[in-house]
Amino acid sequence: MRGLARVMDFMRAVSILFVGINVYWFCYSTLKEWGVTFEVIDKILWNFQRTTGLFSSVLWTKLFAVVFLALSCIGTKGVKEEKITWAKIHCSLAAGVVLFFLNWWLLELPLPHTADTVFYIATLSAGYICMLMAGTWMSRLLKNNLMDDVFNTENESFMQETRLIENEYSVNLPTRFYYKKKWNNGWINVVNPFRASLVLGTPGSGKSYAVVNSYIKQQIEKGFALYCYDYKFPDLSEIAYNHLLNHLDGYKVKPKFYIINFDDPRKSHRCNPINASFMSDIADAYEASYTIMLNLNRSWISKQGDFFVESPIILLAAIIWYLRIYQGGKYCTFPHAIELLNKKYADVFTILRSYPELENYLSPFVDAWESEANEQLQGQIASAKIPLSRMISPALYWVMTGDDFSLDINNPKEPKILVVGNNPDRQNIYSAALGLYNSRIVKLINKKGQLKSSVIIDELPTIYFRGLDNLIATARSNKVAVLLGFQDYSQLTRDYGDKESKVIQNTVGNVFSGQVVGETAKILSERFGKVLQKRQSMTINQREKSTSISTQMDSLIPASKISNLTQGMFVGAVADNFDERIEQKIFHCEIVVDNEKVKRETARYVKLPQIIDFTDKDGNDRMQEEIQANYDRIRQEVRQIVEDEITRIKNDPELCHLIREEEE
């Protein structure tokens, strides 16, 4: 190091020598007047001039001076300084070059030779000093790229799937992802949608527009039977309806499109979710009752098994099963069950106890009744009556008492596209009824030998989906694809309880997440795992700078990145198949949606059809009258059932004691 320093000092001395020679030769007359010329030097310089022409131009000696100055600066190591910047270096260097090289004309000014020489030497010296400062600063410049990537984007970018992998079930989404300082085109290939999919994201993150809509369209194109829960009806329903009209060729048997909509009976089909033909056991009645009551009382989800939770569920289940066995299930509808529940409990218990299969089922109520524990009994009954009374609505009764279609949507002989619409303003009422449709559909479609089908639930926490965890776990073998959309895991835990929420989170194979924050972002970051990342550190002391590079396992997609995703940007992971391996399952990309194409398609959309025309032959709208008449008919039928059953029991010698006990 000392030897190198001596060489650099020597080069700098040579550089200064060339500057002095330049002044000596081109300012000779003035220096002679000052008495600072030497004959020996004169001879040496004249010999150089004759042999090399070194002084034929004022620039040659300057160029040699600058070359040796540059070499001396390159080999010099200075103490690194953060405050030195390229801007300062460039300014100093530019000033030096101008003063050093562009001052020859000062020797020709119409001034005394002494003045010309002083100006020339001053500018030459100032220029040289500026260039020397620039060179010194270059050696002291702190050269590092530590702050070039302050958000660690390069370390956290990775190669993603660029192949399009299609099969008869797949959902394929085009993407753009950042890797190695450029944007690349890629694909998210959901080659096995039957392993269930989750779409997470805060409101406005693009989960419906980028993912849910694409699922609906592509699965209709590939001939799936479809069940869609449309929380903001008719957003998803119109997409499904219009896409079906344009892609009927994807089905071997032309599917029918059905709508359940409580807000507008004109645009709704009628369907009885507890149709007697699909209820083979009292357990089916219990499932229906369970779904209804937990949708009406979300706080009960975390209290399952408690006495005052199970009691109203069992009571409603007994009433549903009674309607199933009474006259072959002729009156087995949910509105009939509500009306029967609201009759005098003495009559209801008397009727239900007259059926052996219900006697043991109702024993807790009967025991309380016979022991005259009226407060307990009334509390049990009120727990069922009060929430169910919110569902007494002529429009709801109308929709739930018809039989326009059955809920086996993936029947190969009669495939269906079914959309059910909710209303955010009436969510608490409608969700209970729609939850009943959900639970029945899950039971009916999750069977072998059926058509491939899809269950799409957007805004999942707005409805309690009984049996969802079991559907996810078993649907793969029955070709049922499940897509669930919601905002984050905490929302799911709040509405489904911790245990069921954890099961749903951990059994889903395909995950899409837009912007989410908090615990959800941390859970997802852990799911995506860690990757080997480069770490660079720098140490600066008075003598030198040292840089060290190390590697460390760190989060591939940190929670902070997930919390700040732009609209349309998604992170996630997909599941693959034995014969369709996807090595890089994780993605962090923008899902590309052709906005212009979507606008053109939307502009051509037709409105959902009117299902029922309530106009009479005179052109008058009779909807309210017909719906009210249906409501009144149901109430009258239930009154008649009670009267007929009480009469039957009174006239039956084996059952009449039930009446007598009550009368006493």
Regions found by a protein language model. Give the residues of each.
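Low-complexity, polar-biased intrinsically disordered regions enriched in Pro/Ser/Thr/Gly
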Residues: F177-W183, N297-F307, R535-Q552
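Hydrophobic alpha-helical segments involved in membrane association or supramolecular assembly
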Residues: L69-T76, G435, S439, N510, ...
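Conserved ATP-driven motor cores of ASCE-family P-loop NTPases powering translocation/secretion/packaging/pilus
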Residues: I472-T474, N478-A575
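Active-site-adjacent beta-strand anchor residues
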Residues: M8, Y229-D230, G514
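N-terminal charged/capping segments associated with class I S-adenosyl-L-methionine
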Residues: I586-C589
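Basic- and hydrophobic-enriched, low-structure N-terminal and domain-boundary segments
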Residues: M1-S205, Y209, S214, N541-Q542, ...
